[in-house]
């Protein structure tokens, strides 16, 4: 944590960024490795962490993974994770994802995912990445959803607070490019208002 506090936080390692970093790695045979399909220079990723600090962070993360026996912890909590997944799936099944293309127009090469951030409290946010697939860049929007409730002893994501957030986060992949197209025309007024 000292490394994160001293070396990473001053450059924006907060809020959504730990998930952005985590999204770039996977665990293979108890080793944390880079995902090869993600576009390395996408977004502001390397403005917020240098490659040297990323490498150091990865080494510290690997040490934590081994020292904490994280895989055992994860395996012990699989029933909870499965229950959370099933509860969230009931929410995701209610979303008409085709509406986005009908309303905004078709969007090619976009992948949308929901990640469950069980320990982040009520916070919600999105992490954006790109990956190469079949010679094309694919935009990835990961909606990271915070805490859930219990209802009748079961994990519960209420539609009144869950659905609007997921819909909002996935709207960004359609709305942000529209904003970028007209930003020069609206930037003065937008800056004045916000």
Describe each region flagged by the PLM:
Residues 1-90:
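Non-catalytic architectural context of zinc metalloproteases
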Residues 89-93, 156-164:
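Solvent-exposed, acidic/flexible segments
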Residues 182-194:
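Flexible internal linker/loop segments at domain or repeat junctions
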Residues 118-120, 151, 155, 171:
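Beta-strand/loop-rich accessory regions of lumenal/periplasmic or secreted enzymes
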Residues 43, 124-160:
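Active-site scaffold of zinc-dependent metalloenzymes
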Residues 160-184:
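Active-site recognition of the HExxH zinc-binding catalytic motif
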Residues 77-141:
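Auxiliary, metal-adjacent structural segments of Zn-dependent hydrolase domains
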Residues 1-11, 95, 99-105, 123-125, ...:
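Ser/Thr/Asn(+Pro)-rich, low-complexity disordered segments
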């Amino acid at each position: 944590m000292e490394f994160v506090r001293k070396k990473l936080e001053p450059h924006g390692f907060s809020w959504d960024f730990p998930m952005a970093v985590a999204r770039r790695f996977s665990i293979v045979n108890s080793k944390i490795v880079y995902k090869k399909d993600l576009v390395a220079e996408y977004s502001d990723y390397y403005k917020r962490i240098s490659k040297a600090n990323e490498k150091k962070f990865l080494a510290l993360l690997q040490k934590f993974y081994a020292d904490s026996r994280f895989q055992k912890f994860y395996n012990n909590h699989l029933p909870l994770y499965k229950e959370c997944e099933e509860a969230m799936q009931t929410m995701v099944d209610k979303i008409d994802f085709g509406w986005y293309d009908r309303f905004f127009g078709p969007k090619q090469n976009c992948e949308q995912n929901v990640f469950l951030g069980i320990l982040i409290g009520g916070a919600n946010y999105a992490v954006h990445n790109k990956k190469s697939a079949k010679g094309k860049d694919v935009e990835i929007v990961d909606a990271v959803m915070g805490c859930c409730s219990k209802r009748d002893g079961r994990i519960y994501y209420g539609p009144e607070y869950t659905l609007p957030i997921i819909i909002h986060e996935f709207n960004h992949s359609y709305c942000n490019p529209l904003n970028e197209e007209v930003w020069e025309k609206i930037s003065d007024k937008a800056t004045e208002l916000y």
